[in-house]
Amino acid sequence: ILGVRSSVFLPFRNLGLVIVDEEHENTYKQQDPAPRYHARNAAIILAAMYGAKTLLGTATPSIETWHNASSGKYGLVELKERYKEIQLPEIIPVDIHELHRKKRMNGPFSPLLLQYIHEALDQKQQVILFQNRRGFAPMIECNTCGWVPKCKNCDVSLTFHKGLNQLTCHYCGYTYQLPHKCPACEGTDLRNRGFGTEKIEDDIKILFPEAAVARMDLDTTRTRSAYERIIADFELGKTDILIGTQMVSKGLDFDHVSVVGILNADTMLNYPDFRSYERAFQLMAQVAAVSYTHLRAHE
């Protein structure tokens, strides 16, 4: 039986083995609606009830799983070599704060990343740019008084989606019309703050007008056919540069990717979550693994 997290509640009769793939994924935890449970933990208990074996598979184990394995509570099996003996990609950290201070940044892109993108395109290789924020800008702010539009339900800043010309709450899904002026001071100088995948797509198309660019996030993959089309076009070489959120890290392998750029990587460390450092590492490692040739740039 191949199933999602709710499959642990099926009426098994003779269970012998449970395999939890990518056990570190936070999507195994159901918070809303009830019942609230973690499918990985439920699978371990289920297997114990039937006297079955449990296999937790991942390249980036969760902290608790790694502790259980290293302390001897779980058995540990390691793969010492990569498939086809492919070498690990080179990771190049770039200090964008220093580049901003010297005014050398081109929007969200460092000179080094742009150089490697140019080289990859010249060599008919592909590029993946990872930004774990969808939309055009994570926040709109009045440049006169500092007013920021927030969701009336969640009290969080609203994300601006340029294609829809609206503000959206990414927590409850509520949408708002983009105001023409600030309701606090009636000023008209409303500025975008930050950048999401939609903004990255716009900027890349300006910087590399000859390249075929695609974006893969929740907004562009509402249907299964749209998701499959984006992946197929990239695999067939119809797309040169793929811009995406964490979707691009989910078990995808591409043969002709030579550059993966992780934009503003350190922002993932600042999420209001006690697992933010753990999840940042897991995401970066999974995105880097997408490159099966040679990772050149990592911001």
PLM segments and residue spans:
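Inter-lobe coupling/hinge segments of SF2-like helicase ATPases
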Residues: 1-296
